[in-house]
Amino acid sequence: MKISRREKPLYALTIALMAVYFVLGCGIFDDYGCGPDEGIERQTSLVNFRYTIERLRLPVPDRWTTFLAYLPDLKEYRDRYYGTALHQPLVLIEAMGNFTMPARDFYRMRHFYTFLNWYAATIFFYALIRRRFGDPLTALIGWLILVLTPRFFAEAFYNNKDILFTAWTIFSLCTVDRWIQRKTVRSALLTAAVLALTVNTRLNGLAYLPIAIAIYFISALRTKEKPRVALTQLLLIGFLFLIFLIAITPNLWESPLPTLIETFRFSAAHPNHSAQGNLFFGKLIDASLSRRYVAVWIALTTPTGYLILSAAGLILFFFETFRRRKTSEPRPSQRSDLLALTIGAVPLLYIVLRHVTIYNTWRHCYFVYPTIVYFAAFAVNRSISKLRAVPSPNVRAGMAGLAAACLIAMIGESGVWIARNHPYQFAYFAPPARPNAEAFSGDYWQLPDRKSVV
């Protein structure tokens, strides 16, 4: 992508901000406590590691065998349906030290690893917005909104399930968009691998494959793509996805189809350990029974300005889509917008309408946040386009200054709050919700207490 002379300072600023965020993450990843999921995820990863060694008959040191012998067999393990492919590199690092790593060190390692995944995802998100709108300023603002969201800022270090899934949702969004655009074997291979890792991280990701196929099919119909080419691509992506998913999920190795069906059943009847344990408007409720639960929590814990921008972007998207509905040739940008919308909305609607079990606030639905930020960037881009079209230089400069001041105030407020409340950004409530924050769940993971233990 060619960079114009006018854009070079903006790119330099973007690179500098990304570098600052990375250095900051490297400096503060040890400031956060440990949630209960981290220990559980480590044990599940070790159980899968043991099964892999035994099933493939890999030669390993006796000290590994002795350590792993105390773990249950995967097929009898209660959490066997949870994938751990993304955590296996951490198990290998522990194994290199014969599993003698102190608890503090492997928790620190996991925090840093979770941050690396999230950091990479933010860069991919920037690239997605840059490619979609062709404007580096829009991409930078979108990136800043994603990074400077208080709860995500904190959980990017210790939430090794929901944040990892959100990060890989972004990777999936980027690779699917590129696959539909390029239609090559290489892009199909990469997309299938990313989708498989996303599904392995959380079964909700299984919705992404049919969404990708449906949008590819719609795009193929509107562009009058040859049926044989389209069918080949769809069969290829489906086949590669299954191969990758089975390969990285040891629980599927013996009987892939029956075990996959068992996994679906387990997910549908998932035990609700937090039933009647979610403080919501001053009452303890079962979150899965309230259809407004997720929406309310999103409104409570996301900076209000971000949500207003996103709502405006969504309205503009539908307006532009219906205005162009008679256009014979679709724009690639419309495909990207539809993909971003459906990848967030479809799984969310399923969870809400089917009363799927939800634990603690809306963290099980964090995957929808990239969609929220995407349409906030949509609104920003349309505003920038309107400003650039103003004929009068003086009026244009005045309006641009006002818009810039509003954006700086909005994003800056979140950034200042993050800095002042470090490392307790997980307790963030949007300004309108703060007077009633005590009526809702707070530190459900007891992170401050766990920090003192570790």
What is the role of each PLM region?
Residues 80-88, 99-123, 155-159, 309:
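Loop-to-helix entry region of an early transmembrane alpha helix in multi-pass inner-membrane enzymes
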Residues 12-15, 125-148, 181-186, 190, ...:
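Transmembrane-helix signature of polytopic, membrane-embedded enzymes
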Residues 165-181, 190-195, 344, 371-375:
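Specific aromatic-rich, kink-prone transmembrane helix
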Residues 112-133, 171, 175, 318-322:
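Transmembrane-helix motifs of polytopic, lipid-linked glycan transferases
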